[in-house]
Amino acid sequence: ITVYEQDFETPESIKGKVFYQIFPDRFCEGVENKPMPFADRIYQADKHAEPFWQPNEVGGHLNEDYFGGDLKGIQQKLPYLHEMGVDFIYLNPIFEAHSNHRYNTADYLNVDPLLGTNEDFEALCTAAQKYGIGIVLDGVFSHTGSDSRYFNREGRYGEGGAYRDPNSPYRCWYDFGPQYKGGYRSWWGFETLPEVNEETPSYVEFITGPGGVIDTWLRRGAAGFRLDVADELPDEFIEKVRAAVKRVSPEKFLLGEVWEDATTKFGFNKRRTYLLGKGLDSVMNYPFKNAVLDFVKGKPAEQAMTEILTICEHYPAPAMDTALNFLSTHDTERALTVIADEPANGRGRAWQSGRCVTGDAYEEGLLRLRMAYAIIYTLPGVPCLYYGDEIAMQGYRDPFNRAFFRWDAHEQRLRPVLAQLAQLRHTCEAFRTGQLRVLRAEDGILHYQRVGKVETAEII
């Protein structure tokens, strides 16, 4: 039994809708052949090229290749997304940062100059609203980049910063000491990602206070935030983020990255409470992804539905109605690769590079991918399409799942199917908050209903 706050509500504007995830550097280049704003960035003009994967001279992977995707490019493709039935775009980080993934934030208050400007972001939000589309941002608040105005190990931002100046106002955000690799506490030992203390008052105020990071971007037009590694943020910090989000509007959305059942998680020496009404609106639904992909690959229907029902039974109804359901993300293999290709099984990037399923295996995989998305679009929660899945892009994990969108792709057979599924969600009330009722889950068959207040949808 999950006991949650009696007044727990989640945004009505999310329920029954469709999300689309974009990795900003790899979607569309609105301003072509732009100069690199920093000398240590490598521009990739060939949009069909594979992302860099070979280690550099010191054996590392710096994520320094940029394909030039930008905010203007996303704005140009709003009609395309609207045709796909997209209601919300979830963007991987857009704040200034010195890697193509931008999870090593350098400046929380400014768009990365390769993506555009703060004004470009506001223009994107305004243009998206005309299509009924909202923009959800990725907030990385458990760590910053070492190459940032806050830490500044590399010296890019002058003489200040916590690493270089013991009197820096940012010094108290971090832990320093000889017991740490590199002399400071970092995220999973990556020295380019110094961890912050989320209980430090000045940091909390910077992120969640009036005029802070959350407030600034929501007022610039964002529809909400996804919290990176929510498991590693204290519940009290998440609650303050929620307060900052809802202070702007109860309809602003707060999503968390959690890979398992979010109601049974333990951390910080206690059971986590972030999904019980005072923290997150909902979470990324990895258990559904695993169950659906395993089912279309041959896993018994009974086992897949048991895993799905477990989440439905554990999650508070307001959170279940807004859970983000997906088959691919920037952190996982693309769905078609999972369905149709060999598992990597620990094999390295050299083996993964250039792999592409073709022929009968591809055609069979495409049929199974279509079925998987039909399930994802009709289960409780909100479906999220990872950019490129609609044209059957392939790829193992980072960086192969982050190739540039193939705008000249011949494969277009999934697009109308996904658009029809989106239209179904928009026109059938049962897909907003309808109860999941299982009629049969055996012999490779899933047969269920979504039972709404006035309509019932039946799916086989």
Question: At which residue positions do the language-model features occur?
Answer:
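Substrate-binding/active-site clefts of carbohydrate-active enzymes
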Residues: 19, 24-87, 94-220, 241-247, ...
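Active-site-proximal helices and loops of the catalytic beta/alpha 8
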Residues: 125-134, 142-143, 148-159, 213, ...
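Conserved, mostly hydrophobic/aromatic
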Residues: 22, 81, 91, 108, ...
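Aromatic/acidic polysaccharide-binding cleft in carbohydrate-active enzymes
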Residues: 25, 267-269, 273-275, 281-282, ...
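Extended acidic/polar, glycine-enriched regions
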Residues: 1-13
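Carbohydrate-binding surface patches
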Residues: 439-460
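Aromatic-anchored helix/helix-loop segment that forms the rim or "lid"
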Residues: 305, 309-311, 345-369
